[in-house]
Amino acid sequence: MSKFLLRPYFKGLRLLLIACWIIAPSFAIAQVDDAQTGKAVFEVLASEIALQRGEAGLAYSTYMEMARQYKDPRLAQRAMEIGITGGSPELALNAAKTWENLSPSSQTKPKEVLVTLLILSNRWSEAVKPAIALLKQQNPSQRESTLAQLQALLAKAKDESDALRAFYEIASTAKPDIKDPSLLYTYAMSAEKAGHLDVMEKTLREILRKNPNDANSLNALGYSLADRNIKLQEAFALITKAHQLSPKDSFILDSLGWVNFRLGKNTLALEQLQQAFKMKPEADIAAHIG
């Protein structure tokens, strides 16, 4: 038999193996009758054939119906994979929710995937509950790794404030375990967005105790104090040090201008703010110039 004639045979064998891989474990546990098992295998085969023919929607729908009927998370997982491959994030997300709901609570992979898909869909607030559930099942090292992944996704958020508030709620679950300075800084900024200025200040001071030359933390703490018009001398000292460490940073120069304005040094403040705006014409800097 030529290798060309063997291709359909191996293709059919592959489909059968997929069906058995998905169906066999759960049906063995459930101890259903042979007729029901045969029907399920047929439906899986039909779905995979439909998928190969370009009928991804039909394959997806069949897998989702089967997942609900047989309470089998692996069928929902397969539907999710079809949704992702087909470039249908909403369908993939719906399947991921079903996968997570049907899976044993001890399994973390469905939660990881669900959280990622929710965040990529800019549904940060919806991601809070499954993300917290995931963190509670992880060890400290795993928690920090998960938070680092979420931190990287903040840059893709359409609504940064909403994303940071959600990040704060999630990260608060693991705060005692966070050691990475970058994560602590993001946690501090998220605390500010969530309205917890006390937590922000405490976290920034924690960073500075370990690294007194962290320019971003110096600037963030100093600006927060200046913006609230409190501890202005400390704010000036913090921002001045940050400026010395990063003299070309327009946002730090903006903070320096702002604290000088709070201190009544209006001429110097205006000069620094205008210079900062010239370096980076951002709306936040322009607002300080007035």
Language model regions located:
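Bacterial N-terminal signal peptides that target proteins for export
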Residues: 2-16
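Intrinsic disorder/low-complexity segments in short proteins, especially the signal peptide
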Residues: 10-11, 20, 47
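Bacterial N-terminal signal peptides
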Residues: 14-25
